[in-house]
């Protein structure tokens, strides 16, 4: 039976990793996979994470199962950074740990389908795996143009989709640092998006993959919070890959905002059932390290400093790259 399988094309984005490693040129630059690198090409472990891992070595006394919801302490520790310090949401918010942001997006789409969503709208271009996940889960994919030719977000295209969507539709939006265009919605545009979603009843799925690496921790989720303040229900996928440097440890979180607190038990039980069937429980180590950082004031301060250093360095590198492009004929 297995000999009947057709070969699949390799993931174009991941293939760039191998191509970059095999390229002998010393002046090569990897602009493919979203991994932070220093000037010498290294992807270092955060100092705060190293210290947290050592604390875990010294204090962790069990490797027993936690269940499909994962480390709830990790999930709760992230909440103030994503939703705000006073974001109780009237008991309408619940979350669970996932294997990376990809696991969170997959769970969001699968849960949406279980709830009756038949079509998910996705801006183009987008992170390639978004479309693959939608196809694999088995929902219809609708599209709209994300970036206009002038380099700004095509807000009218999104608003038109929301206005004409069916009651059983959802829309998947990048919370910040749009991948791959880098074109984000302005605060005023987020206001319009939030109002449109509230009026339409379309379910928002918000993917937050680069929190803290755009303008700042608060600024990067301002749009997400605007939406959540207006809509009755939403799903949020969150990744710790970039802002904690935990790429291969697969650390993510999935949050469900229900219409009422009474709806949460059924929603979370369905999410847990889907997680159980897909990965049983998420890997613990990375989430435990993040929880340890966020529960220790000194480690949190170190992490915030490291994140700010990364953000500022990337800003400088982008400016230098843009300036260099201006000097190359044919690129403007």
What are these regions (language model features)?
Residues 29, 121, 142-144, 205, ...:
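Hydrophobic/aromatic beta-strand patches that form the interior of the parallel beta-sheet core
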Residues 9-100:
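N-terminal small-domain helix-loop-helix segment of the aminotransferase-like
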Residues 302-332:
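Conserved PLP-binding catalytic core of the aspartate aminotransferase-like
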Residues 37-41, 180-181, 213, 245-246:
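Short catalytic/ligand-binding loop motif for oxyanion handling, primarily in non-cytosolic enzymes
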């Amino acid at each position: 039976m297995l000999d009947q399988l057709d070969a699949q094309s390799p993931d174009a984005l991941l293939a760039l990793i191998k191509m970059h490693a095999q390229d002998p040129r010393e002046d090569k630059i990897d602009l493919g996979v979203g991994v932070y690198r220093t000037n010498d090409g290294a992807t270092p472990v955060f100092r705060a994470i190293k210290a947290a891992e050592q604390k875990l070595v010294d204090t962790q006394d069990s490797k027993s199962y936690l269940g499909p919801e994962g480390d709830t302490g990790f999930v709760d520790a992230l909440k103030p950074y994503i939703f705000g310090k006073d974001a109780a949401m009237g008991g309408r918010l619940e979350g669970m740990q996932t294997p990376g942001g990809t696991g969170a997006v997959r769970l969001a789409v699968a849960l949406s389908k279980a709830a009756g969503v038949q079509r998910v709208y996705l801006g183009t271009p987008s992170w390639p795996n978004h479309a693959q996940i939608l196809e694999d889960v088995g929902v219809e994919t609708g599209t709209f143009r994300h970036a206009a030719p002038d380099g700004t977000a095509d807000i009218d295209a999104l608003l038109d989709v929301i206005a004409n969507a069916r009651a059983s539709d959802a829309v998947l939006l990048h919370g910040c640092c749009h991948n791959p265009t880098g074109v984000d919605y302005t605060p005023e545009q987020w206001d319009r998006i939030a109002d449109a979603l509230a009026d339409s009843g379309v379910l928002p799925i918000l993917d937050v993959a680069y929190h803290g690496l755009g303008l700042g921790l608060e600024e990067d989720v301002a749009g997400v919070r605007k939406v959540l303040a207006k809509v009755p229900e939403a799903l949020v996928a969150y990744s710790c890959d970039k802002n904690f440097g935990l790429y291969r440890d697969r650390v993510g979180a999935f949050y469900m905002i229900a219409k009422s607190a009474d709806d949460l038990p059924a929603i979370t039980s369905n999410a847990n059932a889907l997680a159980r069937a897909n990965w049983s429980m998420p890997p613990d180590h990375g989430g435990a390290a993040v929880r340890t950082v966020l529960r220790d004031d000194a480690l949190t301060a170190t992490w915030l400093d490291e994140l700010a250093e990364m953000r500022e360095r990337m800003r400088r590198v982008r400016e230098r790259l843009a300036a260099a492009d201006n000097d190359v004929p044919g690129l403007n």
